[in-house]
Amino acid sequence: MPDRPEIVCICGSTRFVDEMRAANRDLTFAGVIVVAPGEADELITNEQKTALDALHLRKIDLADRVLVVNPGGYVGESTSREIAYAHATGKSISFTDPV
């Protein structure tokens, strides 16, 4: 095992929360440190969404690479911004489904 486990940031639409949880579980059992989107059971305000979006970019900064959970190839607006940010910062990006 390397000195430090790989760190992967999961990105994806909140409509795929179950799939992101499964990816988190699988990566964790594979010895990977996973940084995932925050979750809320209730509706959030626009202000909270803006804050969470900014926080997720910082999570991407912490990661060695990004895994986009995109069943059926779906990538929404927020996820597209995260992919562009990850690309601009030189992160390796992989997808669960073809885009």
Task: Show which residues each predicted segment covers.
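Conserved catalytic or regulatory cores that recognize and/or transform ribose-phosphate-containing ligands
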Residues: 1-99
